[in-house]
Amino acid sequence: MMDKAIFNGLGRRKTSVARVYIVSGNGKLTINDKIFASAEEYFKDRVRARHAFEPLVVTNNDGKLDVFVRVEGGGLSGQAGAVRLALARALIKMDTSFKPVLKSHGMLSRDPRMVERKKYGLRKARRAPQYSKR
């Protein structure tokens, strides 16, 4: 049996869903069963990687926890947002004293913005066909 406590969190953003499991450790990062030295390798961008793992930085747990991430759906930006929310929720399960800090940084709110559906008679969700006067 495992002797370390595992804390989990679920996060969603656009069409992405992320499940994060954190265990006390030395900062090992595993995303979709692949071990990465840094989040930038997966997200291919420093900004998205920093955004996704910001909860660890804000709570001073960067490098102190092993993070296991399962993320699917959407693109890299949506996945980064999903990981961020899931990680924040997992940190709160680990230690409830992190809640005010994470809440003040806006990391506990699920971003409700979704892609608007295309309507019939239009070219896109709101883009109408070009109007011809004559």
From Swiss-Prot:
Pfam families: Ribosomal_S9. InterPro entries: Ribosomal_Su5_D2-typ_SF (IPR020568), Ribosomal_uS9 (IPR000754), Ribosomal_uS9_bac/plastid (IPR023035), Ribosomal_uS9_CS (IPR020574), Ribsml_uS5_D2-typ_fold_subgr (IPR014721). GO terms for biological process: translation. One of its GO terms (cellular component) is small ribosomal subunit. GO terms for molecular function: RNA binding; structural constituent of ribosome. Gene3D superfamilies: 3.30.230.10. Keywords: Ribonucleoprotein, Ribosomal protein. Belongs to the universal ribosomal protein uS9 family. This is Small ribosomal subunit protein uS9. It comes from Pseudothermotoga lettingae (strain ATCC BAA-301 / DSM 14385 / NBRC 107922 / TMO) (Thermotoga lettingae). The gene is rpsI.
